Amino acid sequence: MDDAVSVLVVDDNQGFLRAARAVLEEAFAVHTVENGTDALAFLERRPPFPDAPRPAFVVLDFHLPDMSAPAILGRLAESATLRAIPVLVLSQADWDEDESAARAAGARAFRVKPSRVQALREAVIDFWKEHGDAGADPARRG
């Protein structure tokens, strides 16, 4: 899958990460981390991820144990390279405050975390089609 579109999925729920990998790996090169600290290290290519690929987009849980999505988005906004990466924020809660905070911090989209894995796959592919390379096949880089 060397030519697959790379996505970073950030969530503290290992079950969610396993499910996300299972349903997304047919269309994307999936990378996962469990917290905001590791997400930033991956994106900034710092240890323990100095050779991490630059993801085409990020799927980010709003509520992580070490920092919130807006805090992570704020750090991304400080980097000319990283601020261009589209971020889809997911949350268990359908709270307007969470969506407003995520969008104000730079999230391109906010969705309630789907309960069905197929719905997750559809949401991620739709996000990529809308915010990634225009008209790109999600299984190939444009």
Locate each region found by the language model.
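The feature encodes the CheY-like receiver
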Residues: 65, 95
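Acidic, metal-coordinating helix/loop segments flanking the phosphotransfer/catalytic sites
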Residues: 32-57
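C-terminal output helix
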Residues: 115-125
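Short amphipathic alpha-helix used as the core "switch/output" element in two-component signaling
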Residues: 70-83
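Active-site residues of response regulator receiver
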Residues: 60-61
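Two-component/phosphorelay signaling modules centered on CheY-like receiver
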Residues: 14-34
